[in-house]
């Protein structure tokens, strides 16, 4: 939800550009009220999309990616995966189509992305410089971004979660 909130505030996108897919009807109702398209169907959400952001719990990544694999256009669509602790090798395996895998980006924002104040860590996987710039431009609109090696991603995850942990203590 936080990433969609930030994208809705972005100057790069209009609400009509954004489709949110979720299994939770109140979440869909909220984003529909903001002008985004909403659906319960992940495959439907992928049709016609230039950028697909899979933002799920780590244990849901495999099922989600395998569920959209057949409708992904590896040549024209950009894929962002936001999930802690999921190696790119696993994602490649899950998305393999006869030896072909998509370009994708491992991305770890923090909760401040909803307010366009995130420090977002990005690991390009088989991406060109041009593709990487397109993705960093989007996340720079939502705060700041830093390109990093995948081996450093666990540290990025810890840093991204630190804000949420601190907010939990403040709330207590």
Where are each of the predicted segments found?
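Alpha-helical elements of the RecA-like P-loop NTPase motor core of helicases
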Residues: 1, 29, 62-66, 89, ...
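Alpha-helical structural elements of signaling/regulatory helical domains
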Residues: 13, 74, 126-127
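Conserved beta-strand termini and adjacent loop/short-helix elements that scaffold enzyme active sites
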Residues: 21, 39-41, 107, 148-151
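Short alpha-helical
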Residues: 25-26, 59-60, 86-89, 130, ...
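Rossmann-like NAD(P)(H) cofactor-binding subdomain of soluble oxidoreductases
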Residues: 34, 42-54, 58-122
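Alpha-helical transmembrane segments of helical membrane proteins, especially in multi-pass transport
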Residues: 161-165
């Amino acid at each position: 939800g936080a990433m969609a909130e930030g994208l809705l505030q972005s100057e790069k996108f209009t609400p009509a550009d954004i489709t949110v897919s979720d299994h939770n009807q109140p979440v869909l109702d909220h984003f529909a009220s903001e002008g985004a398209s909403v659906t319960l169907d992940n495959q439907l959400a992928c049709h016609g999309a230039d950028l697909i952001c899979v933002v799920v719990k780590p244990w849901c990544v495999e099922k989600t990616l395998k569920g959209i694999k057949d409708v992904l256009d590896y040549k024209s669509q950009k894929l962002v995966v936001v999930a802690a602790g999921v190696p790119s090798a696993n994602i490649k395996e899950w998305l393999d189509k006869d030896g072909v895998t998509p370009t994708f980006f491992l991305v770890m924002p923090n909760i401040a992305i909803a307010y366009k104040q995130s420090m977002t860590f990005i690991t390009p996987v088989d991406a060109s410089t041009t593709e990487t710039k397109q993705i960093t431009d989007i996340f720079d609109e939502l705060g700041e971004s830093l390109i990093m090696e995948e081996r450093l991603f666990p540290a990025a995850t810890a840093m991204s979660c630190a804000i949420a942990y601190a907010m939990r203590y403040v709330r207590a």
